[in-house]
Amino acid sequence: MDIKRIILYVIVALLAIALFNAWQRDYPPTPKPTPTVEQPTANGDHPTAYTPPAFTPGAAEKTKKAGTIALTSKVPEARLITVRTDVLDVEIDTQGGNIVSAKLPKYPVSLEEKQTPVQILSGEPNELYVAQSGLTNGNGQPTTVQFESAKKQYVLENGQNQLIVQLTGRAPDGLLVTKTYTFHRDDYAIHLAYQVKNNTSKPWQGSLYTQITRRQPPTEHHHFYVRSYNGASMGSPQTPYEKLSYESLDKQNIDRTSQSGWIAMQQHYFLSAWVPGNPELTYHYYSHVIPASGEPNVYVVGFVSPQMNVAAGSEAATHATLYVGPEIAKRLKGLAPGLERTIDYGWLWPISMLLFWILSSVHAVVKNWGWSIIITTILIKIVFYWFSAKSFRSMARMREMQPRIQALKERHGDDRQALSRATMELYRKEKINPLGGCLPMLIQVPVFIAFYYVIIESVQLRQAPFIFWIHDLSVKDPYYILPIIMGLSMLAQQWLSPTSPDPTQQKMMWILPVIFTVFFINFPAGLVLYWITNNVVQTLQQWYVNKTYESHKAKLKARRARKRKR
């Protein structure tokens, strides 16, 4: 194998390792919490699972100290309302009307547990993750309302496209509050509407707040290639996507205003996000951390709407949208600008989005994500064929120069400067770029990395089958057949390459496929499938270039001769 090809493979491997190291640096593993014994409160009862923390808009430091969150008991069943649609199973706590549980029946936890849906929101103390919303008074303090509903169970029946859950209650200051959740068929976006009727004799001032409260989850023990971002994020017209890691929230609270925007909590494949109801208004975004002794901290991120002024005898309304579901670009893009960036495609996000569009377009025809990966890879190799052919021909010319370069080495002996000048003069005379074999191949490296992110982060490939024994393209091949095929494809590619006279390079020809087979053995099957297809197509392209190399060289020589005659 040509030494430049070896260098290219090593660069790709080093890039992968560098990405891993950067990821580890930015998102270090969370230490395991020390087990603690739950202590009852002073009156002998456990406090409720959570309460909306107090805050003062515009004063992040005050939010650190305001409010507490109870960590030792779950919401009583008597307070829960259940809502079931075709894509969501939700539980609402009538105290505050907050969503304390959200499951996704169309997304099983694993292929082995198909009856167990993925749960995003949970009121369980050890995995607290709830979507809260409510009203504040004129002092910025939240008011807790005990709501009532017409039913305890709501189901989106066949033939229905919309399900409305209406909660009513009276606030401590006498306001009549109606909180309405609207669910739609095949939709993970939940519309929230608040209506306030001021039946008192005094004017009322207040705001809508929405927030996500989450205990920092334990680090998932995956291999580095699936170490996806897990934490908070937000977007605004100025900054469409900004990660807010738990570590950064520990150091500094969010305290800023923005027109429209959104706030979210991310995990691999799924997220929850609050989106303001009116993109023309300016909202205050905030966060604070609630320390938990011996356990991971609890993090709160949210926003507050502009203040409403409701005269006595009048009413007002405000609204927002909660998204709880999979990270699907077309769904997220329609909710808020930049929300689709929560699909964490990394620093090559634009390329990844383009590749996913191509991949999904192919899938719309072939209906199989494995075949879609193969076809998309072939299309990529066709697009980059000119670069590959240029690289192959450049390497072939360099091999032709080896006897002449060897002669220069013998002539100049240990005089390295003279050898370097003579070598560069030879390259100039023969119109050879010594980097011509590497650069065209390096241009393709960003595409490989971008496609890597597409396969790792796209929820559409989660539990997607291919053929035969491959039932999930997002996890490793259970029988390691694909990594072995990949190693064999590398051997075939090297066998086609002219043998180098250098014994060291000859050894590398046989060692490198083994190294890459081991390196890829735990990679997702979809990524290995891409690499196999890439190798096979590249081998065929190299075979064709080698076959036509002499005729290409003759045509090039004739073209240069015609130019000299002119």
UniProtKB/Swiss-Prot annotation:
Write down the InterPro entries for this protein, in alphabetical order.
Membr_insert_YidC, Membr_insert_YidC_N, YidC/ALB3/OXA1/COX18, YidC/Oxa/ALB_C, YidC_ALB_C, YidC_periplasmic_sf
Keywords from UniProt, A to Z, are: Cell inner membrane, Cell membrane, Chaperone, Membrane, Protein transport, Transmembrane, Transmembrane helix, Transport
Answer yes or no on keyword Protein transport: yes
Q: Name one GO biological process term.
A: protein transport
> What Gene Ontology terms describe what this protein does at the molecular function level?
membrane insertase activity
Task: Write out the annotated subcellular location.
Answer: Cell inner membrane
- Residue ranges crossing the lipid bilayer per the database entry: 3-23, 346-366, 369-389, 436-456, 509-529
Answer whether the UniProt record assigns the keyword Coiled coil to this protein: no
Its placement in the membrane is given as:
Multi-pass membrane protein
Question: Which is one Gene Ontology cellular component term of this protein?
Answer: plasma membrane
Q: Tell me which family the UniProt entry assigns to this protein.
A: Belongs to the OXA1/ALB3/YidC family. Type 1 subfamily.
HAMAP family recorded: YidC_type1
UniProt function note: Required for the insertion and/or proper folding and/or complex formation of integral membrane proteins into the membrane. Involved in integration of membrane proteins that insert both dependently and independently of the Sec translocase complex, as well as at least some lipoproteins. Aids folding of multispanning membrane proteins.
Subunit annotation = Interacts with the Sec translocase complex via SecD. Specifically interacts with transmembrane segments of nascent integral membrane proteins during membrane integration.
Q: Any idea what this protein is called?
A: Membrane protein insertase YidC
Q: What is the taxonomic lineage of the source species? A: Bacteria, Pseudomonadati, Pseudomonadota, Gammaproteobacteria, Legionellales
What's the encoding gene here?
Answer: yidC
